[in-house]
Amino acid sequence: SKKIVTAERSGVSNKVYVDGIRPTGFKLSAIKQDWDFLLGLYSTEENPEFDAKWDQGLAYQGTLGYQMNDEHKLVADFLYNDSGVGQENQWTYEWALSLRSEYVADRWGVMTEGFVGDNGDEANGVTKAERQGHFWAAVITPYYYIIPDRLQLGFQYQYSASTRDEGVRTSSRYLRRNHADPTVDVGGGRGNEHHSYYLGLNYLLCDHNAKIMTGIQYDDLNAEEGKVTGTTYWFAYRTFF
Protein backbone atom coordinates (compact mmCIF):
# COMPACT_ATOMS: atom_id res chain seq x y z
CA SER A 1 0.00 0.00 0.00
CA LYS A 2 2.99 2.35 0.17
CA LYS A 3 2.68 3.26 -3.52
CA ILE A 4 -1.11 3.07 -3.59
CA VAL A 5 -2.75 4.94 -6.48
CA THR A 6 -6.15 5.43 -4.79
CA ALA A 7 -6.90 7.25 -1.54
CA GLU A 8 -8.02 3.99 0.08
CA ARG A 9 -7.51 0.30 -0.60
CA SER A 10 -10.25 -1.59 -2.41
CA GLY A 11 -12.96 -3.24 -0.33
CA VAL A 12 -11.85 -6.76 -1.25
CA SER A 13 -8.22 -5.95 -0.36
CA ASN A 14 -9.37 -4.76 3.06
CA LYS A 15 -11.18 -8.07 3.46
CA VAL A 16 -8.46 -10.45 2.29
CA TYR A 17 -5.46 -8.50 3.63
CA VAL A 18 -7.13 -7.51 6.89
CA ASP A 19 -6.04 -3.99 7.80
CA GLY A 20 -4.48 -3.47 11.21
CA ILE A 21 -3.81 -7.07 12.26
CA ARG A 22 -0.32 -8.09 13.33
CA PRO A 23 -0.58 -11.84 13.99
CA THR A 24 2.04 -13.75 15.92
CA GLY A 25 3.73 -16.29 13.69
CA PHE A 26 6.64 -17.32 11.54
CA LYS A 27 7.60 -16.59 7.94
CA LEU A 28 10.07 -18.36 5.71
CA SER A 29 10.98 -16.66 2.44
CA ALA A 30 13.45 -17.42 -0.33
CA ILE A 31 14.49 -16.08 -3.74
CA LYS A 32 15.90 -18.13 -6.59
CA GLN A 33 16.59 -16.36 -9.88
CA ASP A 34 13.23 -14.97 -11.08
CA TRP A 35 11.18 -16.80 -8.44
CA ASP A 36 10.36 -15.82 -4.87
CA PHE A 37 8.57 -17.88 -2.26
CA LEU A 38 6.99 -17.30 1.14
CA LEU A 39 5.48 -19.69 3.68
CA GLY A 40 3.75 -18.39 6.80
CA LEU A 41 2.25 -19.92 9.93
CA TYR A 42 0.30 -17.68 12.32
CA SER A 43 -1.76 -17.89 15.48
CA THR A 44 -5.32 -16.64 15.03
CA GLU A 45 -5.35 -15.29 18.60
CA GLU A 46 -6.00 -11.56 18.74
CA ASN A 47 -3.13 -10.93 21.17
CA PRO A 48 -0.43 -9.19 19.05
CA GLU A 49 2.42 -10.00 21.46
CA PHE A 50 4.97 -12.72 20.79
CA ASP A 51 3.69 -14.82 23.71
CA ALA A 52 0.33 -15.34 22.02
CA LYS A 53 -1.16 -18.76 22.65
CA TRP A 54 -1.14 -21.36 19.90
CA ASP A 55 -4.23 -23.24 21.13
CA GLN A 56 -6.82 -21.05 19.38
CA GLY A 57 -6.37 -21.72 15.69
CA LEU A 58 -3.79 -21.50 12.94
CA ALA A 59 -3.59 -19.67 9.63
CA TYR A 60 -1.39 -20.96 6.82
CA GLN A 61 -0.05 -18.70 4.07
CA GLY A 62 1.72 -19.49 0.82
CA THR A 63 2.97 -16.96 -1.73
CA LEU A 64 4.67 -17.55 -5.08
CA GLY A 65 6.03 -14.77 -7.28
CA TYR A 66 7.60 -14.82 -10.74
CA GLN A 67 9.45 -11.89 -12.33
CA MET A 68 8.73 -12.35 -16.04
CA ASN A 69 10.97 -9.43 -17.06
CA ASP A 70 12.03 -6.01 -15.77
CA GLU A 71 8.50 -4.64 -16.20
CA HIS A 72 6.16 -7.53 -15.42
CA LYS A 73 5.64 -9.65 -12.28
CA LEU A 74 3.05 -12.31 -11.39
CA VAL A 75 2.11 -13.20 -7.80
CA ALA A 76 -0.16 -15.90 -6.33
CA ASP A 77 -1.14 -15.70 -2.66
CA PHE A 78 -3.18 -18.19 -0.60
CA LEU A 79 -4.31 -18.21 3.03
CA TYR A 80 -6.24 -20.88 4.93
CA ASN A 81 -7.73 -20.22 8.37
CA ASP A 82 -8.59 -23.30 10.48
CA SER A 83 -10.00 -21.56 13.57
CA GLY A 84 -12.93 -23.36 15.15
CA VAL A 85 -16.08 -22.50 17.10
CA GLY A 86 -15.28 -20.42 20.18
CA GLN A 87 -11.69 -19.72 19.12
CA GLU A 88 -10.29 -16.26 18.48
CA ASN A 89 -10.07 -15.34 14.82
CA GLN A 90 -8.39 -12.33 13.19
CA TRP A 91 -9.41 -13.29 9.66
CA THR A 92 -13.07 -12.99 8.67
CA TYR A 93 -13.01 -15.83 6.14
CA GLU A 94 -11.99 -19.50 5.87
CA TRP A 95 -9.73 -19.27 2.85
CA ALA A 96 -8.83 -16.90 0.03
CA LEU A 97 -6.73 -17.06 -3.13
CA SER A 98 -5.47 -14.01 -5.01
CA LEU A 99 -3.69 -13.77 -8.36
CA ARG A 100 -1.94 -10.51 -9.20
CA SER A 101 -0.23 -9.07 -12.27
CA GLU A 102 2.00 -5.98 -11.89
CA TYR A 103 3.23 -4.20 -15.02
CA VAL A 104 5.43 -1.11 -14.72
CA ALA A 105 6.59 0.75 -17.84
CA ASP A 106 8.38 4.10 -18.19
CA ARG A 107 5.51 6.49 -17.42
CA TRP A 108 2.60 4.14 -16.90
CA GLY A 109 1.66 0.89 -15.26
CA VAL A 110 -1.26 -1.34 -14.38
CA MET A 111 -2.07 -3.77 -11.59
CA THR A 112 -4.69 -6.46 -12.14
CA GLU A 113 -5.94 -8.64 -9.29
CA GLY A 114 -8.37 -11.54 -9.07
CA PHE A 115 -9.75 -13.01 -5.83
CA VAL A 116 -11.80 -16.04 -4.85
CA GLY A 117 -12.55 -17.38 -1.39
CA ASP A 118 -14.94 -18.77 1.20
CA ASN A 119 -16.40 -16.52 3.89
CA GLY A 120 -16.58 -19.49 6.24
CA ASP A 121 -19.31 -20.33 8.75
CA GLU A 122 -19.87 -20.54 12.50
CA ALA A 123 -16.47 -22.21 12.90
CA ASN A 124 -14.82 -19.03 11.61
CA GLY A 125 -16.99 -16.69 13.66
CA VAL A 126 -19.38 -15.95 10.76
CA THR A 127 -22.63 -16.77 12.52
CA LYS A 128 -25.10 -15.15 10.10
CA ALA A 129 -25.96 -17.38 7.14
CA GLU A 130 -26.37 -14.42 4.77
CA ARG A 131 -22.69 -13.48 5.34
CA GLN A 132 -21.33 -16.96 4.59
CA GLY A 133 -20.83 -18.58 1.18
CA HIS A 134 -18.20 -17.99 -1.49
CA PHE A 135 -17.00 -14.65 -2.82
CA TRP A 136 -15.02 -13.53 -5.86
CA ALA A 137 -13.65 -10.21 -7.05
CA ALA A 138 -11.53 -8.42 -9.65
CA VAL A 139 -9.65 -5.12 -9.38
CA ILE A 140 -7.83 -3.28 -12.17
CA THR A 141 -5.73 -0.20 -11.40
CA PRO A 142 -3.95 1.59 -14.29
CA TYR A 143 -1.99 4.81 -13.83
CA TYR A 144 -0.06 7.33 -15.92
CA TYR A 145 2.53 9.97 -14.95
CA ILE A 146 1.47 13.25 -16.55
CA ILE A 147 4.67 14.74 -15.13
CA PRO A 148 7.29 12.03 -14.46
CA ASP A 149 7.73 11.31 -10.74
CA ARG A 150 5.53 14.29 -9.84
CA LEU A 151 1.92 14.24 -11.12
CA GLN A 152 0.14 10.89 -11.44
CA LEU A 153 -3.27 10.13 -12.95
CA GLY A 154 -4.89 6.99 -11.54
CA PHE A 155 -8.01 4.94 -12.18
CA GLN A 156 -9.47 1.88 -10.47
CA TYR A 157 -12.40 -0.40 -11.20
CA GLN A 158 -13.37 -3.06 -8.68
CA TYR A 159 -16.05 -5.72 -8.83
CA SER A 160 -17.00 -8.19 -6.11
CA ALA A 161 -19.84 -10.65 -5.70
CA SER A 162 -20.99 -13.48 -3.45
CA THR A 163 -23.35 -16.43 -3.34
CA ARG A 164 -25.05 -14.98 -0.23
CA ASP A 165 -27.01 -11.75 0.29
CA GLU A 166 -24.34 -10.09 2.46
CA GLY A 167 -21.23 -11.96 1.35
CA VAL A 168 -19.23 -8.91 0.19
CA ARG A 169 -18.68 -5.52 1.82
CA THR A 170 -17.66 -2.03 0.75
CA SER A 171 -14.90 -0.01 2.39
CA SER A 172 -15.88 1.85 5.56
CA ARG A 173 -15.76 5.27 3.83
CA TYR A 174 -18.18 6.67 2.78
CA LEU A 175 -21.05 4.84 1.10
CA ARG A 176 -22.14 3.32 4.40
CA ARG A 177 -22.82 6.77 5.86
CA ASN A 178 -24.27 8.69 2.92
CA HIS A 179 -25.90 7.27 -0.21
CA ALA A 180 -28.43 8.33 -2.81
CA ASP A 181 -31.54 6.64 -1.35
CA PRO A 182 -31.60 7.01 2.47
CA THR A 183 -34.75 4.85 2.67
CA VAL A 184 -32.67 1.78 1.77
CA ASP A 185 -30.77 0.23 4.68
CA VAL A 186 -27.18 -0.11 3.49
CA GLY A 187 -26.66 -3.01 5.89
CA GLY A 188 -23.21 -1.92 7.04
CA GLY A 189 -22.04 -1.82 3.43
CA ARG A 190 -22.83 -5.49 2.83
CA GLY A 191 -24.46 -7.00 -0.24
CA ASN A 192 -24.11 -9.67 -2.91
CA GLU A 193 -22.65 -7.50 -5.69
CA HIS A 194 -20.56 -4.33 -5.70
CA HIS A 195 -19.12 -2.11 -8.45
CA SER A 196 -16.76 0.77 -7.74
CA TYR A 197 -15.09 3.33 -10.03
CA TYR A 198 -12.32 5.71 -8.95
CA LEU A 199 -10.51 8.50 -10.81
CA GLY A 200 -7.89 10.66 -9.18
CA LEU A 201 -4.76 12.82 -9.34
CA ASN A 202 -1.76 12.39 -7.05
CA TYR A 203 0.89 15.06 -6.52
CA LEU A 204 4.12 13.52 -5.27
CA LEU A 205 6.00 15.84 -2.92
CA CYS A 206 8.77 13.37 -2.08
CA ASP A 207 8.21 10.35 -4.32
CA HIS A 208 5.50 8.20 -2.65
CA ASN A 209 6.87 8.99 0.81
CA ALA A 210 4.72 12.14 0.86
CA LYS A 211 1.91 12.91 -1.59
CA ILE A 212 -1.35 14.80 -1.92
CA MET A 213 -4.21 12.71 -3.31
CA THR A 214 -7.49 13.90 -4.82
CA GLY A 215 -10.17 11.78 -6.43
CA ILE A 216 -13.80 10.96 -7.09
CA GLN A 217 -15.34 7.54 -6.45
CA TYR A 218 -18.71 6.10 -7.47
CA ASP A 219 -20.10 2.98 -5.76
CA ASP A 220 -23.00 0.75 -6.74
CA LEU A 221 -23.98 -1.88 -4.15
CA ASN A 222 -26.73 -4.47 -4.38
CA ALA A 223 -27.67 -4.58 -0.68
CA GLU A 224 -30.15 -7.00 0.86
CA GLU A 225 -32.92 -4.35 0.89
CA GLY A 226 -32.20 -2.85 -2.52
CA LYS A 227 -29.70 -1.03 -4.70
CA VAL A 228 -27.49 1.60 -3.07
CA THR A 229 -25.35 4.16 -4.95
CA GLY A 230 -23.11 6.95 -3.76
CA THR A 231 -20.38 9.37 -4.84
CA THR A 232 -17.36 10.19 -2.68
CA TYR A 233 -14.94 13.09 -3.21
CA TRP A 234 -11.45 12.50 -1.85
CA PHE A 235 -8.71 14.81 -0.61
CA ALA A 236 -5.93 13.13 1.33
CA TYR A 237 -2.33 13.52 2.41
CA ARG A 238 -0.46 10.22 2.64
CA THR A 239 3.02 9.74 4.03
CA PHE A 240 5.36 6.99 5.20
CA PHE A 241 9.01 6.84 6.25
Model region roles, listed by residue range:
Residues S1-Y66, V75-D82, Y174-V186, R238:
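Surface-exposed coil loops of outer-membrane beta-barrel proteins
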Residues L74-F241:
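Outer-membrane beta-barrel pore domains
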